[in-house]
């Protein structure tokens, strides 16, 4: 059973298993959604552009976010909890959620975690930051950051710890509020040196910049 279209007054029936693509997209008056037990999948763009959405309750039966931008541009959303059964999501699940400050993952989840209150979704096995937000701290132990993990987020400052070995292209794409970027001095892959940027040491390639960036003369 798949819900294909909803509105701000919809109460999702108990027998629904999937929230379809763009089912609630552009429901600008939707402020709260309770996804009932039994739902296992939320498809791409399901709640995209629900600009008033502040309160999201997800079921323990949820397993997958597919298609990306599931909560894209929910500009009023400030916090969300990922249930224990979720084992699949795209990195741009929260793209454009400029107010999102807190992301927590149920401690019983075997695929993802939000270690040390980092306010991000981490792939536990790969130590990969999958999805972040305005309030994310990239904690030590993270080895890589996914493409589009912070796409159009409200993040204002970024610190790359020594453990990060790979920042995928577009990981911080269109982060227009970001004003400060630093890299741990003993990071083997990247450097910053007070330039408000991330530069790959081996190639001198500018990987990440912001409005306050000073570009090294040696940057290629």
Task: Name what the model sees in each region.
Residues 1-18, 28-41, 50-64, 74-88, ...:
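Structural signature of tandem-repeat unit edges
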Residues 20-23, 43-46, 68-70, 91-93, ...:
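Consensus positions within tandem repeat domains that build extended binding/scaffold surfaces
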Residues 23, 125-128:
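A short, hydrophobic secondary-structure junction motif
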């Amino acid at each position: 059973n798949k819900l294909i279209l909803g509105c701000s007054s919809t109460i999702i029936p108990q027998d629904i298993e999937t929230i379809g693509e763009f089912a609630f997209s552009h429901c600008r008056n939707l402020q709260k959604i309770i996804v009932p037990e039994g739902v296992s999948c939320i498809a791409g763009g399901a709640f995209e552009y629900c600009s008033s959405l502040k309160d999201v309750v997800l079921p323990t039966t949820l397993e997958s976010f597919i298609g990306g931008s599931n909560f894209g541009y929910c500009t009023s959303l400030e916090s969300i909890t990922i249930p224990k059964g979720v084992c699949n999501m795209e990195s741009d699940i929260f793209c454009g959620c400029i107010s999102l400050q807190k992301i927590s993952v149920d401690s019983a989840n075997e695929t993802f975690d939000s270690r040390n209150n980092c306010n991000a979704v981490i792939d536990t096995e790969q130590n990969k930051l999958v999805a972040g937000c305005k309030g994310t701290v990239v904690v030590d132990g993270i080895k890589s950051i996914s493409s589009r993990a912070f796409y159009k987020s409200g993040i204002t400052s970024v610190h790359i710890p020594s453990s990060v070995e790979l920042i995928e292209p577009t990981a911080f794409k269109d982060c227009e509020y970001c004003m400060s970027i630093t890299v741990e001095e003993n990071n083997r892959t990247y450097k910053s040196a007070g330039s408000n940027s991330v530069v790959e040491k081996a190639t001198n390639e500018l990987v990440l910049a912001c409005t306050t960036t000073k570009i090294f003369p040696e940057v290629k």
